[in-house]
Protein backbone atom coordinates (compact mmCIF):
# COMPACT_ATOMS: atom_id res chain seq x y z
CA UNK A 1 0.00 0.00 0.00
CA UNK A 2 2.59 2.50 1.11
CA UNK A 3 4.94 1.94 -1.83
CA UNK A 4 2.18 2.71 -4.35
CA UNK A 5 0.71 5.67 -2.49
CA UNK A 6 1.42 8.86 -4.45
CA UNK A 7 1.21 11.51 -1.71
CA UNK A 8 3.05 10.40 1.39
CA UNK A 9 3.18 12.37 4.61
CA UNK A 10 6.37 12.67 6.67
CA UNK A 11 5.64 9.58 8.78
CA UNK A 12 4.97 7.44 5.72
CA UNK A 13 8.18 8.60 4.02
CA UNK A 14 10.20 7.83 7.15
CA UNK A 15 8.51 4.46 7.64
CA UNK A 16 9.18 3.40 4.07
CA UNK A 17 12.75 4.73 3.95
CA UNK A 18 13.76 2.97 7.16
CA UNK A 19 12.01 -0.37 6.58
CA UNK A 20 14.94 -2.31 5.10
CA UNK A 21 17.27 -2.70 8.09
CA UNK A 22 14.39 -3.32 10.50
CA UNK A 23 12.85 -5.98 8.26
CA UNK A 24 16.21 -7.70 7.76
CA UNK A 25 16.95 -7.72 11.47
CA UNK A 26 13.42 -8.86 12.31
CA UNK A 27 13.62 -11.76 9.86
CA UNK A 28 17.05 -12.73 11.18
CA UNK A 29 15.86 -12.64 14.81
CA UNK A 30 12.71 -14.65 13.98
CA UNK A 31 14.72 -17.31 12.11
CA UNK A 32 17.24 -17.58 14.95
CA UNK A 33 14.42 -17.81 17.50
CA UNK A 34 12.81 -20.62 15.51
CA UNK A 35 16.12 -22.52 15.46
CA UNK A 36 16.79 -21.89 19.17
CA UNK A 37 15.62 -23.73 22.28
CA UNK A 38 12.76 -21.23 22.66
CA UNK A 39 9.98 -23.77 22.02
CA UNK A 40 11.40 -26.21 24.59
CA UNK A 41 11.69 -23.39 27.11
CA UNK A 42 8.15 -22.27 26.36
CA UNK A 43 6.82 -25.80 26.77
CA UNK A 44 8.60 -26.05 30.13
CA UNK A 45 7.16 -22.67 31.16
CA UNK A 46 3.66 -23.86 30.18
CA UNK A 47 4.07 -27.00 32.28
CA UNK A 48 5.24 -24.90 35.23
CA UNK A 49 2.42 -22.37 34.76
CA UNK A 50 4.85 -19.47 34.32
CA UNK A 51 3.08 -16.11 34.29
CA UNK A 52 4.39 -12.90 32.75
CA UNK A 53 3.41 -9.34 33.54
CA UNK A 54 3.28 -8.57 29.82
CA UNK A 55 4.31 -4.94 30.12
CA UNK A 56 7.00 -4.99 32.77
CA UNK A 57 8.58 -1.54 32.73
CA UNK A 58 9.86 0.91 35.31
CA UNK A 59 6.41 2.54 35.29
CA UNK A 60 4.86 -0.64 36.68
CA UNK A 61 7.20 -1.09 39.64
CA UNK A 62 6.57 0.57 42.99
CA UNK A 63 9.48 0.87 45.40
CA UNK A 64 8.22 0.72 48.96
CA UNK A 65 10.61 2.43 51.43
CA UNK A 66 12.74 -0.48 52.54
CA UNK A 67 9.91 -3.00 52.21
CA UNK A 68 10.76 -4.16 48.69
CA UNK A 69 9.17 -3.75 45.31
CA UNK A 70 5.66 -4.28 44.04
CA UNK A 71 4.64 -4.85 40.43
CA UNK A 72 1.34 -3.23 39.40
CA UNK A 73 -0.92 -3.00 36.33
CA UNK A 74 -1.24 -6.60 35.22
CA UNK A 75 -3.65 -5.75 32.37
CA UNK A 76 -1.47 -7.55 29.79
CA UNK A 77 -0.49 -10.60 31.85
CA UNK A 78 -0.04 -13.86 29.97
CA UNK A 79 1.48 -17.29 30.16
CA UNK A 80 4.99 -17.09 28.71
CA UNK A 81 8.67 -17.28 29.54
CA UNK A 82 9.52 -14.99 32.41
CA UNK A 83 12.58 -13.88 30.45
CA UNK A 84 10.11 -12.10 28.13
CA UNK A 85 9.35 -9.68 30.97
CA UNK A 86 13.07 -9.15 31.50
CA UNK A 87 13.50 -8.50 27.78
CA UNK A 88 10.66 -5.97 27.75
CA UNK A 89 12.09 -4.21 30.80
CA UNK A 90 15.62 -4.14 29.39
CA UNK A 91 14.47 -2.86 26.00
CA UNK A 92 12.62 0.05 27.61
CA UNK A 93 15.60 0.99 29.80
CA UNK A 94 18.23 0.49 27.09
CA UNK A 95 16.29 2.65 24.61
CA UNK A 96 16.59 5.48 27.12
CA UNK A 97 20.30 4.81 27.75
CA UNK A 98 21.64 4.53 24.21
CA UNK A 99 21.73 0.73 24.25
CA UNK A 100 24.54 0.86 26.80
CA UNK A 101 26.22 -2.49 27.39
CA UNK A 102 27.09 -1.31 30.90
CA UNK A 103 23.42 -0.65 31.69
CA UNK A 104 22.46 -4.04 30.23
CA UNK A 105 25.11 -5.76 32.32
CA UNK A 106 23.91 -4.06 35.52
CA UNK A 107 20.29 -5.08 34.87
CA UNK A 108 21.24 -8.64 33.99
CA UNK A 109 23.50 -9.00 37.04
CA UNK A 110 20.81 -7.67 39.39
CA UNK A 111 18.21 -10.01 37.87
CA UNK A 112 20.56 -13.01 37.91
CA UNK A 113 21.38 -12.43 41.58
CA UNK A 114 17.75 -13.28 42.38
CA UNK A 115 16.97 -15.67 39.54
CA UNK A 116 19.88 -17.04 37.52
CA UNK A 117 19.25 -17.56 33.81
CA UNK A 118 20.23 -20.74 32.02
CA UNK A 119 21.92 -20.76 28.60
CA UNK A 120 18.66 -21.11 26.69
CA UNK A 121 17.08 -18.19 28.54
CA UNK A 122 20.10 -15.99 27.86
CA UNK A 123 19.91 -16.87 24.16
CA UNK A 124 16.16 -16.14 24.16
CA UNK A 125 16.80 -12.78 25.84
CA UNK A 126 19.45 -11.92 23.23
CA UNK A 127 17.05 -12.78 20.42
CA UNK A 128 14.20 -10.88 22.08
CA UNK A 129 16.35 -7.76 22.27
CA UNK A 130 17.47 -8.18 18.66
CA UNK A 131 13.91 -8.02 17.30
CA UNK A 132 12.77 -4.53 16.16
CA UNK A 133 9.75 -4.39 18.49
CA UNK A 134 9.29 -0.62 18.47
CA UNK A 135 9.45 -0.36 14.67
CA UNK A 136 6.99 -3.24 14.39
CA UNK A 137 4.64 -1.52 16.85
CA UNK A 138 4.72 1.78 14.94
CA UNK A 139 4.26 0.07 11.56
CA UNK A 140 1.46 -2.13 12.91
CA UNK A 141 -0.32 0.85 14.46
CA UNK A 142 -0.07 2.69 11.13
CA UNK A 143 -1.33 -0.31 9.17
CA UNK A 144 -4.36 -0.72 11.45
CA UNK A 145 -5.27 2.97 11.63
CA UNK A 146 -7.12 5.56 9.59
CA UNK A 147 -4.46 6.73 7.20
CA UNK A 148 -6.01 10.18 6.75
CA UNK A 149 -4.47 11.42 10.01
CA UNK A 150 -1.12 10.37 11.47
CA UNK A 151 -0.21 11.40 14.99
CA UNK A 152 2.72 13.78 15.17
CA UNK A 153 3.80 11.82 18.24
CA UNK A 154 4.26 8.70 16.10
CA UNK A 155 6.38 10.66 13.64
CA UNK A 156 8.58 11.82 16.53
CA UNK A 157 8.82 8.26 17.88
CA UNK A 158 9.93 7.01 14.47
CA UNK A 159 12.52 9.79 14.16
CA UNK A 160 13.88 8.92 17.61
CA UNK A 161 13.92 5.23 16.77
CA UNK A 162 15.81 5.87 13.54
CA UNK A 163 18.30 8.07 15.39
CA UNK A 164 18.92 5.19 17.85
CA UNK A 165 19.17 2.54 15.14
CA UNK A 166 22.98 2.48 14.94
CA UNK A 167 23.30 2.11 18.74
CA UNK A 168 20.69 -0.66 18.77
CA UNK A 169 22.35 -2.57 15.92
CA UNK A 170 25.76 -2.15 17.57
CA UNK A 171 24.31 -3.62 20.78
CA UNK A 172 22.54 -6.46 18.95
CA UNK A 173 25.58 -7.41 16.89
CA UNK A 174 28.06 -6.73 19.68
CA UNK A 175 29.61 -9.07 22.16
CA UNK A 176 27.37 -8.34 25.14
CA UNK A 177 25.89 -11.83 25.27
Regions found by a protein language model. Name each.
Residues 32-82:
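Active-site acidic catalytic loop and adjacent metal/ATP-binding pocket
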Residues 1-51:
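ATP-dependent phospho-/nucleotidyl transfer catalytic cores
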Residues 39, 127-128:
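Short acidic/histidine-centered micro-motifs embedded in hydrophobic/aromatic stretches
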Amino acid sequence: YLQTKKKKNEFEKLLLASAGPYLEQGERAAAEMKASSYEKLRQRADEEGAVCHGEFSQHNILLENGRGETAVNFDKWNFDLQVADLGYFMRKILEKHGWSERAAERILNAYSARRPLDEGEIETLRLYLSYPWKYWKLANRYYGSRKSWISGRNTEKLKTLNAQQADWLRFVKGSFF
